[in-house]
Amino acid sequence: MRKSYSPSDIESVVQKHWYKNKTFAVIEDSNKEKYYCLSMIPYPSGNLHMGHVRNYTIGDVISRYQRMLGKNVLQPIGWDAFGLPAEHAAIKNNTDPSIWTYSNINYMKSQLQSLGFAYDWNRELITCHPDYYRWEQWFFTVLYKKGLVYKKTASVNWCSYHKTVLANEQVTNNCCWRCHTPVKYKRIPQWFIRITNYADQLLHGLDQLTHWPEQVKIMQRNWIGRSKGVNVTFRIENSNDTLTIYMTRLDIFMGITYLVISTDHPIALQVAKTDLNVAHFIQKNDDFYTKLNKKNVFYFEKMGMPTHIYAIHPITNSKLPIWVANFVIPMECDGMGAAISIPAHNQQDWEFAYKYNLPIKPVIKNLDAIEPNIAMQAQETTCDGILFNSGEFDGLSSCTASNAIVKSLIARGVAQYKVNYRLKDWGISRQRYWGVPIPMVTLSNGVVKPVLLDRLPVILPKNMSTIHRSNDGYVDNSLKMYPNWIQTTYKGQAAIRDTDTFDTFMESSWYYARYTCPRYNDAMLNVHAANYWLPVDQYIGGIEHAIMHLLYFRFYHKLMRDEGLVYSDEPAIRLLCQGMVLADSFYYVSPNGQHIWVDPTHVTIKRDRIGGIVKAIDKDGRDLIYDGMCKMSKSKNNGIDPNIIIEKYGADAVRFFIMFAAPIEAPLEWKESGIEGAQRFLKRIWNLIYHHIQDGPVDALSVVILNHAQKFIRYNVHKTIEKVTDDIDRRQSFNTALSAIMKLVKKLYNAPKTSMQDRAVLQEALLVIVRLLYPFTPHISFILWKALGGSEDIDNATWPIVDTQAIQNDRTLVLVQINGKMRHKVFAPLNSDKNVVYKLLETEGVLNKYLIGKKINNIIYVPNRVINIIAK
């Protein structure tokens, strides 16, 4: 063992050992309890960032810990390799996206290996490889045959920059989640998967997920948005047509004075054929949707156009004018594109009615029985009140009236109960090149067929062709630009391929299952292997995926279950959502007013006495503005390159800091001083063990002859095992686990080391510490374990077990003072009197040097805590 700790010397050696011996490769073993630990699959963007490092370090700590418990641990890794960034890079560099993607994978793989993660690299997946997406295409054809897939022309979210459709979940503040371009609404043919068929299962399944963060479950419940209501059918005057509208609140039904429909509602489109005003209104307000969403609807002018068509109120038989309105969005109106209007009790409806001189009819008094004043605004929403102006329902409470009105409507044959969902079917068509081709063809007679199994996979055309730019400068590189590829055959008949590709969330919705059998060629999954490993025991990823990936992840699992591929109802038992990694951010303002963000590593900082930043300058001497701790990002240029930090401090120090600096679900503030502190601690461990070994061989530990000080050390060692085990396993409080280990190391530095049993106790303690540290800092632990004489490699060592005898509470630690100064500590039986404690001190002979030539005048004793001997 070398005298000095040098991570660059040991880490590569240990990593080569793991790679050569395939230490972490696993197979199914029915004789061992399995444990499947998985961090969310990374996108090969070109470089790991510290968010990646935090995510994968957490997974590795848990995996190594579970392995030490004797479990058969699967921890795989792969690459979610399709997507727009690769396509954009290819366009920019005039190359094929596969070249960019595989180059990035090779580099990022080397980064992961340099951090020492215990992956089974034999199971590495790359989702853009045909061997992977072949089965995704096959499964799509299975769902199509089951009726769970359909194609329709629909109003969709359209990103004009990327020239592709976005799912509802991919729209943030009415902008594309990637490029932040305002989203437009467009009607185009799209493939959908019926996720709404599984809405109740997805909702009720959340109750099984007792080890998922409550915040994630709340977000999914809200996104699914189950509501109970009534579908009410309104007859159209002088027509056999009807208009059906979903309602959740019926006590205000008698206050309906007009109806509104969206600009693409069939009634609106029909009227537009003969009414130029309506036609012009529809055309004019198409762009309105680019500005509108649920959050800002109140800040835009509400506009409408009468259709001169009337619906009939089912109870009063009064005529209700139907208006085309710019604030009715089909996907926001439960897919019906129509809504009732009760202007007396809804501010948006009131504003519209006031503007166009439509009737306003109040029908609910508050519980004080005062009629609402609606001259200036609608009545504030009330959950309860008394009906008036409502005919036969006058005088009823809101609750009673709701039930009575529903019964009346049902009796008239114009209403039925309906459970509705905010969740909409998953639109999976994307109009880009770099994705999985949708395996459908259209015959010359217009019949659509799924591609046959023996013709799968449908592979992308080789090499992206000439870049196509539209008049507005946006790139259109969808598969429709590849005419030779589009032409194909189906059972000898001429056919054309579908030119859309799958939403990339498809690939990331089932990768976890394919990890269980990545080289299996006979089916999508090897059912035996999949159901040995599944469900995932521990899944790790950011909470930002709550209503996208994590919802599709659960949905896809249920689809595979219903195909008999997996047996469990949910894909993952436990979910951990780690916090973001934050770093200092600095900028200056350029002459043209732009914020120019400066790499923190190029900044010189002056701090005040409490550590606050009071001045910052860049390498050119320019004064900078400090923007605080922000999420590491390219946009603020405050990311930290893991390679530089690993080279400087070592992978173990990085891993230690990542796990120690903050509770795992909280944001982590990146500070290089914290990495320095982690490395100092590892050096202390190394030095402690080095000097212990230099002192020569160690006798066997004999617990029956230990003195009080030695027992005290063992007590601390085994209490630390107990705490660290609970912190890692149950609480997942990794920072407090490391804190406990650090406290124990400090105690060992001060422990007696003179006698052979002193050294035997220390040997036991050091072997424990190295094993406790192994999940966090595996490289240094590997070397120190061997140096201490540990049997085999530490990779095969077991987690330390608490010696319950060592931590029994029949003894207590009493502090010993001479004239008020701390001189010693002694273990004494609980509740001993001062004579017993003093006798123990006499037996140990530790007081003699302090009492020579002195007379004891008094002994002050606080039971179980302190004894103070007063001597002169």
From Swiss-Prot:
Annotated EC: 6.1.1.4
Keywords for the protein's UniProt record, in alphabetical order: Aminoacyl-tRNA synthetase, ATP-binding, Cytoplasm, Ligase, Nucleotide-binding, Protein biosynthesis
Q: Which residues bind ATP?
A: K634
Q: Per the Swiss-Prot or TrEMBL record, what residue ranges does the short sequence motif 'HIGH' region cover?
A: 42-52
May I have one GO cellular component term?
cytosol
State where the protein is found: Cytoplasm
The primary site where this protein sits is: cytoplasm
Q: Name one Pfam family in it.
A: tRNA-synt_1g
The residue numbers the entry assigns to motif 'KMSKS' region are: 631-635
Is Disulfide bond set as a keyword in this record? no
Question: Which family does the UniProt entry place this protein in?
Answer: Belongs to the class-I aminoacyl-tRNA synthetase family.
Q: What is this protein called?
A: Leucine--tRNA ligase
Please report the organism this UniProt entry assigns to the protein: Blochmanniella pennsylvanica (strain BPEN)
Q: Which gene encodes it?
A: leuS
